[in-house]
Amino acid sequence: MVVYLTHWFRQEDRGKAVAMFMAAIPVSNAIGAPVAGLLLRLHWLGISGWRWLLILEGVPALLGGVVALFYLTDRPKEARWLTGEEKDWISGELGKEKGKTHGHGDMLAALRQPFVWALALAYFLINTSGYGLNIWLPKMVQKFAGLTTFEVSLVVAIPFAVSVPAMLLAGWHSDKTGERRWHAALAAITAGLGLALSQLVNGNPVLIIASFSIAAVGIMSFYPTYWAMATGLLSARSAAAGFGFVNLIANFGGFVGPYMVGYLTDRTGTYAAGVYSLVATALLSAVVLIAMRHRKPAAVGVALNPDVLVP
């Protein structure tokens, strides 16, 4: 989807564009958590609540995919809902950026670039923290607050709801300043600090939720600024291969984060060790980004700008 956005938005607008697109993640979590709590209580037509949850939340997603298939187009010039002037302007602006690329792009060319591996590592680390928090947050809330399943779903929605405006603001500010790397790094640091703070507030439920909200703000603000940076480092031809590799590595964080928290919780009998492991991965993600530096790109078709960030 990020590659698709590069076909529609200029580099200078991609922070806002990615933020608006990815804001669907915390919005869906904020709305979906309490809705799921309600659906789990249903017992219609002899069908249990968890089955209704899958049906009523799965069908709209399928319908949305069908609508997108027939409504969205690959390129602006194919969009029937744009005027000719709008199509020409978008194509012209994106054409200027394509003119800055060098050589050709393929999977091997992308993988030969150290910054692609650095991008993958940074994304893997923040995903480890994000998925670890997302999966275990309901259980942690239920333990320290002693709430019902529905009450837990309402509380869990708070961090995600708070993160939405912060995410949009991060994307907007990154576009306004033209700075990407430090925006993403500071977001990862914020996530780590929020997670650490949750273990230092002496079990106060309000402060724990506030701390997790800070962590969610950091994690969700990372995504638009990170992807705005990444789309400026890979040419259009290399983007699909490069981003595919980045996502391949990063998605392992969806396994490592929850498993790591569960394992450490079982070994220690407390969530603290697991949460601190998420602190470590968030801060390491920031370290990877901060360690990247400016260098002139080699003409192998992966650089979009004359100055890119590589380790």
Where are these regions (language model features)?
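Cytoplasmic helix-loop-helix junction between adjacent transmembrane helices
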Residues: M1-A23
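Intracellular juxtamembrane helix-capping segments at the cytosolic ends
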Residues: M1-F9, S221-L234
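Glycine-rich segments within core transmembrane alpha-helices of 12-TM secondary carriers
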Residues: G15-L38, W44, P60-A61, N247-G257
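Helix-to-loop junctions at the C-terminal end of transmembrane segments
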Residues: L40, A166-E179, T265-D266
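Symmetry-related core transmembrane helices of the 12-TM Major Facilitator Superfamily/SLC fold
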Residues: R51-F70, V275-I290
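Extracytoplasmic gate region of multi-pass secondary transporters
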Residues: L108-G171, Y223, W227, G257-P258
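C-terminal transmembrane helical hairpin of 12-TM major facilitator-type secondary transporters
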Residues: R180-M229
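A late C-terminal transmembrane helix in Major Facilitator Superfamily
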Residues: T231-T270, L278
